[in-house]
Amino acid sequence: MLIIETLPLLRQQIRRLRMEGKRVALVPTMGNLHNGHMKLVDEAKARADVVVVSIFVNPMQFDRPEDLARYPRTLQEDCEKLNKRKVDLVFAPSVKEIYPNGTETHTYVDVPGLSTMLEGASRPGHFRGVSTIVSKLFNLVQPDIACFGEKDFQQLALIRKMVADMGFDIEIVGVPIMRAKDGLALSSRNGYLTAEQRKIAPGLYKVLSSIADKLQAGERDLDEIITIAGQELNEKGFRADDIQIRDADTLLEVSETSKRAVILVAAWLGDARLIDNKMVELA
């Protein structure tokens, strides 16, 4: 497994792979890898000849400096996991390598609408940072496919739109959420939970599933469903942050013509902001 930290060396390797006619898959990550990331890697391996995993804690997508400072950097352990998975290339650049003149004056990519709604409204600049780094990685790696987790539902929708709008010839693969046995969605942020909070955390998925059951049973008073869900989260020990029921295809408000809904839930548990989602067919 090659570990590359600089743009010139990465370009050199990508040129070689292209000359050899290899099909390349990219899995962009911020490191602190868990089994959910490994599922992305496995999906990439099944679809391509060569798998490139990027590990970069992107300062442009953090709206709070303290979150950036405390995000775990576990490069050695991450590389060991990826090596066991037989990943071909890890791209692990420094911030200076990606943003040589800092982030303030760096050219950015913005996806209007999707970048400022829902999660984007509570995390200003976050999605602009995501679309900027992902587009840069696409330009550098030139993958045939790229794999992203469906846990970050809005991020996946944003990347799909960016790819369509910018004309990237890249297949975007959404990989289903991987959960612990108790239902908790795997996330790097789960590492912020204390042992006691970890016992409470599966309650998020239980509330999410309860909303889904109500929708599938034909309930359509969304305001009431959301209010009750928020109360249930707070009773379980969470601080409900945002609960939304949206059209799964547009992320706009659910309408009479909506065929699928996505339930998006965000809640604080101690210092960890947990997010999860679930899709529901609207008959």
Swiss-Prot record:
> What is the name attached to this protein's record?
Pantothenate synthetase
Task: State where it is primarily located.
Answer: cytoplasm
SUBUNIT field = Homodimer.
Q: What start-end ranges are recorded for coiled-coil regions in this protein?
A: none
User: What InterPro entries does UniProt report for this protein, alphabetically?
Assistant: Cyt_trans-like (IPR004821), Pantoate_ligase (IPR003721), Pantoate_ligase_C (IPR042176), Rossmann-like_a/b/a_fold (IPR014729)
User: Where, by residue number, does beta-alanine bind?
Assistant: Q61
Residue numbers annotated as active site: H37 (proton donor)
**For (R)-pantoate, which residues are the binding ones?**
Q61, Q155
Q: What class of enzyme is it?
A: ligase
Q: Which SUPFAM superfamilies match?
A: Nucleotidylyl transferase (SSF52374)
- Which reaction equations make up its catalytic activity? (R)-pantoate + beta-alanine + ATP = (R)-pantothenate + AMP + diphosphate + H(+)
One molecular function GO term is: ATP binding
Biological processes annotated in GO: pantothenate biosynthetic process
List the signal peptide residues.
Answer: none
Recorded E.C. number(s)?
6.3.2.1
Q: What is the lineage of its organism?
A: Bacteria, Pseudomonadati, Pseudomonadota, Gammaproteobacteria, Enterobacterales
Binding-site residues, ATP: 30-37, 149-152, 186-189
**Superkingdom of origin organism:** Bacteria
